[in-house]
Amino acid sequence: MGSSFKSPADTAKACSAIAELKEKAPLGKVIVLSFLAGAYIAFGGLLAEVVTGGMAKAGYPAGLVKLVFGAVFPVGLMLVVIAGSELFTGNCMYMPLGILDKRASIMGLIRNWVTSWVFNLVGAVFVAYFLAVATGILTADPWQAGALTVAKTKALGGASFIAAGKVTKSLTWAQAFWRAVGCNWLVCLAVYLAIASDDIIGKIWGIWFPIFAFVAIGFEHSVANMFFIPVGIFLGGVTWSQFFMNNLIPVTLGNIVGGAIFVACLYWYTYLKE
């Protein structure tokens, strides 16, 4: 009986080969798959907000709320990896690894990153408006209050606000950046573990643990925030400029560092550098 998983070196080679395929993918397919990835991550975010919406107000410990939020969110990345789609944060690992292994180009990276980022945003905002707000799922309490707290914590740039009767501090630019570094380090490891596994159950567990960890810790994922913060915008608690300037820019940059440096570069150096 053969092994059901790849060695770390073979996994690095497989990721490099995937980068080559992404380099050659037709633009139209990348656009569709990027829209789907944004929607899939948004589904995970919507599920997490629904199941935890009233927990803080009901007096549950903050750690338990984070645990439940993190436990259900990984369904989004499971859909991305197993059903197939183009997720910007995963591409922050794939494309640099392919470039270092001479199987992808800088121009291919730029095309892939820009396309996946833009259409991840389109897919996530689509779910935020049409499936979370227009449906009424997140417009009634306690879910509206919970969704607004999540969005404000991420997007108010260090300002304080009242949530569940308590003063809550939002993230500063630097905090958002470093939380994003940690986030995509773990997200890309989740993708790496999924590629390492040759069966679907192994892929599911390989994804679940690192994604659960990043969410429960409180790290920042750019594509997830393309859902969480627009929900807050549609509910009237945050502005588009606050979204981009205070969160999406630093979190995107931090996600690039986390995936490209701490996963792609280090595993290329360890397993692929000749």
From Swiss-Prot:
Family matches, as Pfam families: Form_Nir_trans (PF01226)
Q: Show the GO cellular component annotation of the record.
A: plasma membrane
Q: Which InterPro entries match?
A: Aquaporin-like, For/NO2_transpt, For/NO2_transpt_CS
Where in this chain does the entry annotate a coiled-coil region?
A: none
What GO biological process term is on the record, naming one? nitrite transport
Q: Mark the transmembrane ranges.
A: 31-51, 62-82, 118-138, 176-196, 200-220, 226-246, 248-268
Q: Which UniProt keywords apply?
A: Cell membrane, Membrane, Transmembrane, Transmembrane helix, Transport
> What is its membrane topology?
Multi-pass membrane protein
* Record's keyword annotation contains Thylakoid: no
Subcellular location(s) per record: Cell membrane
Task: Write down the PROSITE patterns for this protein, in alphabetical order.
Answer: FORMATE_NITRITE_TP_1, FORMATE_NITRITE_TP_2
Q: Does the keyword RNA-binding apply?
A: no
Query: What family is this?
Result: Belongs to the FNT transporter (TC 1.A.16) family.
Q: What does this protein do?
A: May act as a formate transporter.
Q: Which PANTHER family match?
A: FORMATE TRANSPORTER-RELATED, FORMATE_NITRATE FAMILY TRANSPORTER (EUROFUNG)
Which protein are we looking at?
Probable formate transporter
Species in which this protein is naturally found? Methanothermobacter thermautotrophicus
Gene that codes for this?
A: fdhC
